[in-house]
Amino acid sequence: MHEFDYVFCQTISASRSPIYERAVQASFGVLNDYHAIREAGGNKTPFALRVQNTGNLFAAQALPAWDTLRQRRLGESPMKIRTRLERVVNANHGLVVTPDLYYMRNRGRKKGDRSISMMSAMLGTALDVKPVVHSHRGETTPVAKVRGFEQAAQKVFDTLALNVRAGGLMVPAVTLSYGGELDEMHAMPGYDALAATCRDHDVELVESMMGLTGIINIGKGALTAAYCKEGPLNLA
């Protein structure tokens, strides 16, 4: 704590987890007690801690963090970063598609998510129809139904590519998180076109294997993605 003057703590959507509220409560204690710790480290300057609800989850949590680091490298002040982050969070669009609807539905209902009904899970499994779920400002909503998981994944890739080509991204990056080996994701239809589009438009494609928490919540083999642009979702 004595090495830094300003800390941003960014959490998963408060509508999906109590982590945000707990972090806010913990921050009160930190801000009350930091003086002695900093003085022991030879630092007598003030310390600030900002807990931020990203209003999103999975790959969409990465964009605010990525942009925070970018703004820091650009030398922006903490106040400017804080103000910008509010806009980034409000413009952040996440997309989720999973191969196992029953699993995602059952896990989601435990956290208050009703975006996939029992009937949708039954019909989707029987007909191999996968919903594309949109996460934005703390809400999750199905926005498309596609036959086959790889085709649903392609719709996600195509949506990112469409928004990259259209311009106007608030953050010059798009993010992907996959619940498996990344080589599997790279082999899916639409991925190569997305990667090429990002290169052509100088937009960074940030990708990672999904963490254990994500896999537990939406299932092995799930794909999540995000882009940041003001306005409604622009779906391919």
List PLM regions with ranges:
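N-terminal glycine-rich phosphate/adenylate-binding segment common to multiple enzyme folds
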Residues: 1-30, 34
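Mixed-charge interfacial surface used for oligomerization/domain docking
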Residues: 19, 25-28, 38-40, 46-50, ...
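Short beta-strand->loop
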Residues: 11-13, 52-55
